[in-house]
Amino acid sequence: MLHLPVLPVTGNISSGDYASTYSHSNESARPGYYQVFLERYGVNAELTSTLRCAYHKYTFRPDDDKKVLVDITRTNNGVRDWSIQKVDDYTFSGNQDAEGNIRFYAVSNYKIEDIRQLKNGEHEVSVVSFADSKGSKPLELKIGFSFVSIDNAKMNLEQEMKDKSFAQV
């Protein structure tokens, strides 16, 4: 999950100002599970994973449009190249070439409306917006990773999480 920083967001954001505060009293962690309430966005974020996949579950306020910010343009080691693209109505994929080249394949339970880029000086982020996303149903992202190819990232996702719920993972 380190190579693909994903942050659930709402409202207007910029590539230079999107961090959220949180309280340790609204955070919990145990092996295989992490949860935090993001105060700025009013989102409860839950994460779990398998060996080569991540499962994100974001519970937004019912009146908020659901979006995620994907920040693959920087790492501790510097990014040489990156890409993110919509594959189909529910899927996006891409890569980040930093110290190694990691590919990802992400499937959402909401239809993807668009993926747009926000740039502030030299820093650029991607914002994935979801269609008809208001309501209490959480946004769930299943993300497969591979150092070989996007096809392998998809295969890893299908092998490790295909029909599993968040609780099953």
At which residue positions do the language-model features occur?
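Accessory carbohydrate-recognition regions in carbohydrate-active enzymes
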Residues: 1-169
